[in-house]
Regions:
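Enriched for short, Lys/Arg-rich terminal
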Residues: 2-5, 14, 18, 24-25, ...
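A short, surface-exposed loop/turn module that caps and links secondary-structure elements
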Residues: 32-60
Length: 89
């Protein structure tokens, strides 16, 4: 794939904007890095018991936040769709 796009369907962008500022920056920076490496070694297939093709869970333990996203090919591009962002409790 020569090009990648990031989508924020549903409420995912609002979930990011609702985070405290330092975590918001961390999540935004992490999403930016997904453009260079859509499936980093820290990303786990999701759900763990029966993974869906292209679905990942990226847990950032030092920041206490998890990002769920999908990576799918579309017309010669990879589309990274941020599905859900949540603070770990």
């Amino acid at each position: 794939m020569s090009d990648r796009l990031v989508r924020f369907p549903g409420m995912s962008w609002q979930e990011i904007e609702a985070l405290p500022q330092p975590l918001r920056w961390t999540v935004q920076r992490t999403i930016f890095h997904l453009l260079g490496e859509p499936v980093p070694t820290l990303a786990d297939p999701f759900p763990s018991d029966d993974p869906l093709p292209g679905a990942y869970e990226l847990h950032l333990p030092s920041d206490g936040v998890t990002i769920w996203y999908t990576v799918t090919p579309h017309e010669g591009q990879e589309v990274i769709s941020i599905q859900h962002v949540r603070l770990d409790t």
